[in-house]
Amino acid sequence: MSKKSFILLNGNISVLIFSVLRDEFSVNYSVDKILNRVLVPRDMQEIRQWVESRYIMSYRNDIRVFFDILGVSRIEDFIEITNCVSLKDTYWVKGLNSKKHWDTVSPYRNPLNKVIADYSFNRRINGKNITGSPDFSTDGNFPKCWKRMNGEIYLLKAGSSGAINSGNEPYSEVYACKIARRLGIGVVDYTISDYKGVTVSKCKCMTNEKFGLISYRDLYRVYECDFERLLNSSKSDVDKKFLIDMLLLDYVTCNVDRHYGNIGIIVENSTNRVLGYSLLYDHNLSCIPYYMKDEDLEFYISDICAKDGRSFKDLFKLIDCTYVRHKLQKLVGYNVSIGCKRDRVVRDMVKIQLRNALKY
């Protein structure tokens, strides 16, 4: 049996020591010593699960093929080379006797690895020099990568491909952003860009070395969507208002993909203290990206549903109140536009949702 020991850190603060134990039949993990219980990652249920979450990547099914091509065959090798860095927080891992420190591995301070970014975006391998990269720990089903531009870090995310109605998802991010701003709802700013000849949505990284991000799912370990239960679990009026705003935006934009994994919560990295909900993000499946012009729009909207299975009419009933109706008045006469051929369809969608809600 072989044993390799590592230390998990938050910035330059040691949090715990763990080991990877390997024999000819299996690979096991053990937590050997907790050094700072307060700073144990909030999304850590067990050490194996946490380490594996640091290399989920967009194309998770191909991740082992990627490692094999680059000569990284064991999890111990992956940890040593990449240090399990992420843009979600300031946690990282090094060998127990390693001299590395946070300044040398931080994705906020160091160049982002182009080889890994290219693979995360288009599954192509251009070179073999890999280091720590936040692309490893960025989940989701669409091609995406992190890029540093003019001193800022941005997430670039492409749409689907291969079908007549594919590729509209990046535009949905921008439409939803504009509608949210019209409603006075806090949202990450998205724009349309081009990367390697592909249309992508572009947004600035919302985290930094002071503030990290954890999903509602990972913080509370709740996996099945139930928006009524979510509203009833609100711990304050501020939280409830946030959730109502979120569901209102989802109603207006017909967002079919609001799940607990894309409801973000801000954490103070240095203390592990939960601060509150983040800006809203990840709306690429809102604004009916797969609708085609020969379909009946009203029927199409009535036939799709929110992530917890309820119709959008029922979603509105869940949040219907004077506050919501006052917000919706801001959309009366509003013609959202991003200069795209889908402008008319999205405007008509908003009008239908307004009419269904306000009965005019």
Q: What is each model feature region?
A:
Residues 1-248, 252-254, 266-360:
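Phosphate/dinucleotide-binding and metal-coordinating scaffold of catalytic cores
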Residues 259, 264-266:
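Conserved protein-kinase catalytic-loop segment immediately C-terminal to the catalytic Asp
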